[in-house]
C-alpha cells in the first residue's frame, strides 16, 4: 500500500520549540515534532526547533536528515575521530552513518525531516563529546 504525505500540511501543524536543550523532555517537545510514517525498519519524523539537540546515534542503520528550512551546525563523531562540526542549511541532506554520534545546534530555528532507522541511543547532557557518558536507549 502506498503512503502519501503532504509535508507542507504536516509542517504547518507544528510549532517552533524555542530554547531546546539536550535535557528538553519529550513532553516539552510536544507539538514541535511529529511521527509521520513508518519506513523500512524505522520512522519518518518532522520537527521544528531552536536551540541545541541531544547527542544521538542509531546502531541499526544510517539516518537521513533533510533541512527543510533554516540552518544549523551538525556535530558528528565517527569511529575514534574528534568531533567534527559541519554547517548545514536549507535544501541540504545529511546522511549520518550507522552508529555515529551526532547532534544539531540551531540557534535561529530549523525545520527538519528525518528518516530514522530502528532504535536510538541518546546522551541527554550538554557535553562536548558523547563518548564520555553512558547512553540511554529508547
Per-range role (PLM):
Residues 1-47, 54-55, 136-138:
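A short, N-terminal "cap"/entry segment at the start of jelly-roll beta-barrel domains
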Residues 49, 59-78, 115:
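Short, conserved beta-strand element in jelly-roll/cupin
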Residues 55-57, 62-67, 85-86, 94, ...:
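His/acidic/aromatic-lined binding-pocket segments of jelly-roll/cupin-type domains
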Residues 78-98:
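Short acidic-glycine-tyrosine-enriched beta hairpin
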Residues 44-45, 53-55, 70-76, 93-94:
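Short beta-strand segments in beta-sandwich/barrel cores
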Residues 42-43, 61-63, 109-110:
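Short, surface-exposed beta-edge/turn micro-motifs
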Residues 123-138:
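Acidic/histidine-enriched, glycine/proline-rich intrinsically disordered or flexible terminal extensions
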Residues 87-89, 98-126:
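Ligand-binding loop in jelly-roll beta-barrel domains
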Amino acid at each position: 500500500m502506498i503512503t502519501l504525505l503532504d509535508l507542507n500540511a504536516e509542517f504547518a501543524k507544528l510549532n517552533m520549540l524555542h530554547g531546546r536543550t539536550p535535557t528538553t523532555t519529550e513532553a516539552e517537545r510536544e507539538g514541535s515534532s511529529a511521527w509521520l510514517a513508518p519506513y523500512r525498519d524505522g520512522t519518518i519524523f518532522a520537527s521544528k526547533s531552536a536551540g541545541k539537540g541531544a547527542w544521538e546515534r542509531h546502531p541499526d542503520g544510517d539516518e537521513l536528515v533533510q533541512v527543510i528550512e533554516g540552518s544549523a551546525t551538525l556535530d558528528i563523531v565517527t569511529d575514534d575521530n574528534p568531533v567534527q562540526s559541519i554547517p548545514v542549511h536549507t535544501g541540504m541532506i545529511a546522511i549520518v552513518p550507522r552508529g555515529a554520534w551526532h547532534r544539531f545546534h540551531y540557534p535561529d530555528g530549523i525545520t527538519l525531516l528525518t528518516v530514522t532507522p530502528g532504535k536510538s541511543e541518546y546522551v541527554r547532557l550538554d557535553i562536548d563529546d558523547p563518548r564520555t557518558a553512558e547512553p540511554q536507549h529508547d
